[in-house]
Design a protein with these regions (language model features):
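Membrane-anchoring hydrophobic helices of lipid-metabolizing enzymes
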Residues: 1-126, 140
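Soluble catalytic domains of membrane acyltransferases
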Residues: 89-232
Length: 232
């Protein structure tokens, strides 16, 4: 499929970009130090540079790991077996844990969780409905599900996210669904979500973003109108 080719080419480009970024790091440090003296906040440009370098490096390490997992699973032959599925979830969890740990330390990111504790639903799968609130919120909720609630998420994603190589490769190897905001004739969105919900284990969580984009009053009104048109 086209996403495999794009994932291979895009993944190689990200790894090459990461190597180039590290080679030119002394120059970036000089530029960031210069800008930090002219921007508000304490060493803002240097902190953003560090987080960008970290994100690139983590993504490259994940891509290399995904290649290794593909080879180790018999070039994808055993990819759906429990061990290899767990290995992919572990890779995803490691990436998010390190990214958010550094974001908390470097950017003073603070995430407050309210509601039931992780022990509130022992042995039960979860259905999680989330509202988009801005950049990074999807990563935030997935990180909370994996590293706070110790869940393996099954996610309904917008199909445009397949263009991001790491997301496209990793999400296709795990039980997730990429959907179009305007399904083509013959595409039953409800059936796709229902198929994804079947067979949820005790440590699984089905994550859905019903609005499909950042919240606006107009988008909410249109979503309600679509549901009424469907008789829901």
């Amino acid at each position: 499929m086209w996403w495999r080719v794009f994932g291979l080419v895009g993944g190689a480009a990200i790894v090459a970009l990461t190597i180039g970024a590290w080679i030119w790091l002394p120059l970036w440090l000089i530029v960031a130090a210069f800008l930090s003296g002219r921007l508000p906040g304490r060493w803002r440009a240097l902190r953003l540079l560090w987080l960008a370098m970290l994100a690139l490096t983590l993504e490259s390490l994940v891509l290399v790991s995904l290649l290794g997992l593909w080879i180790g699973s018999g070039f994808g032959l055993w990819m759906r077996r429990p061990f290899w599925q767990w290995a992919h979830y572990d890779c995803m969890q490691w990436y998010l844990r390190n990214l958010f740990r550094e974001a908390t330390r470097v950017l003073r990111l603070r995430i407050v969780t309210v509601g039931p504790t992780p022990e509130a639903f022992p042995g039960d799968p979860l259905l999680v409905l989330s509202r988009h609130a801005g950049p990074g919120d999807s990563f935030t909720i997935v990180n909370a599900l994996m590293n706070t609630y110790d869940r393996e998420p099954r996610i309904v994603l917008k199909n445009t996210l397949m263009w991001e190589p790491t997301i496209g490769i990793l999400m296709h190897r795990l039980p997730n669904r990429f959907v179009r905001p305007d399904p083509r004739p013959g595409q039953d969105l409800r059936s796709q979500v229902a198929d994804l919900a079947r067979g949820l284990d005790s440590d699984d969580a089905l994550l859905i973003f019903p609005e499909g984009g950042n919240f606006t009053p107009g988008r909410r009104t249109r979503a309600i109108a679509r549901l009424r048109h469907l008789g829901l």
